[in-house]
Design a protein with these regions (language model features):
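N-terminal nucleic-acid-engaging modules of covalent nucleotidyltransferase systems
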Residues: 1-181
């Protein structure tokens, strides 16, 4: 199925919160993929930077409760939001200062902007049926993914088990991985 069958204008770059609403409005996997390709082709950097912030498990903001906007503000620029998120990631903004800053951003942003875009980034859930796998498969801009390598069952490779070998039992359980910066 081509992107044109979904009436997607490839020359028009949408605002990120409108893209999220478009993605959540349809359950069609093919349409979601077409939308991701359209935005990738349009090089919608703001959209993919926000998606990266939301879907990258290595990026944490240290915020538990993010308010929902109930009134329109004058609008919040992406640059201002990204600046504050950077401070949250580095833990330069914590406690009451963090809460007050997030509340201030919520008041300044439009309801659409905040509830459908910025808030979803902070809670790390875009709620539109798109995962990092979809983004990475259909976009030139990738979201970092970390997956733990699992052990293979040797029963599938019995012919390779010749000569002297060192064998350890395959155990199921919790893996602990430490990342030192």
């Amino acid at each position: 199925i081509s992107d044109s069958s979904y009436n997607i204008d490839e020359d028009y770059m949408m605002r990120p919160w409108d893209i999220i609403k478009e993605l959540e409005s349809d359950n069609s996997r093919l349409k979601k993929e077409a939308i991701i390709r359209r935005e990738s082709d349009a090089e919608n950097i703001e959209f993919f930077n926000g998606v990266g912030m939301a879907l990258d498990g290595f990026r944490t903001f240290g915020i538990q409760k993010v308010p929902t906007s109930k009134a329109d503000g004058k609008g919040l620029s992406w640059e201002r939001f990204a600046y504050v998120v950077n401070k949250l990631e580095k833990r330069e903004l914590t406690g009451n200062d963090m809460r007050n800053t997030v509340d201030h951003m919520c008041e300044n942003a439009t309801m659409d902007q905040w509830n459908n875009w910025y808030r979803r980034i902070l809670i790390k859930d875009l709620r539109c049926g798109v995962t990092h796998k979809t983004i990475n498969k259909h976009s030139t801009i990738k979201v970092p993914v970390f997956e733990c390598m699992l052990a293979d069952d040797s029963k599938k490779h019995e012919k390779k088990m010749v000569g002297e070998v060192i064998v350890e039992p395959k155990l199921d359980g919790v893996r602990v991985i430490t990342i030192c910066d």
